[in-house]
Amino acid sequence: RIITPLTSMGVKIQSNSGKLPIKIFSSNLKSIEYELPIASAQVKSCLILAALDGNGRTVLKEKIKTRDHTEIMLNELGAKISSNSHIIINPLDTDLKPFHVNIPGDPSSAAFFASAAALLPNSDLTIKNLLANSTRIGFFHVLEKMGAIVTWQNMRKEIGEIVGDVNIKSQPLSGIDLQGEIIPSIIDEIPIIALLATQADSPTCVRNAEELRHKESDRIDAICHNI
């Protein structure tokens, strides 16, 4: 998925039919216009970083918006990236600025603790200093829609990113239908959502999650087998 667009940018890549071993030869990078075939923040971030060294403006098109940490941080450090209907990356005309940052908690890791709190009767859990980027907290919206009580507080910013504390209180859970634009923001949390669904009082259905088959393993298959 990354070889094709990088080749279009002028990178010479030798691979074993798209698999390892792989050789990459440095070259002058060209600007491109490219539509990501699958919603993938990893592929998008690779192309953004490459585009910073391009010879002109690169335009990336997403069918569904994915997490935007790369764009936020690079803009805070001096890059010129705009993101509306398309992502437009201008090549760097100066070095990125040095920075200090307190790295917030990862929402995907926090999802396991939040799930335990939602399932255990009379639980009341607060997770502090958690990243609250809107493209990453879809899980907490899902948890709330399933019936848990979810409250955000102490909101602030760290290098352009929203950070806060989240409180979860247990309540009986109901099933939910998940599809479309929310999927990229919960793609890593679907396995734990599947576990929550086994304890809900009605069925849960997840659609448009084909990206799970292209992770380090086929996570859809793993979810079905493990549960």
Write out the residue ranges for each language-model feature:
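Structural preference for solvent-exposed beta-strand-turn elements
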Residues: 1-226
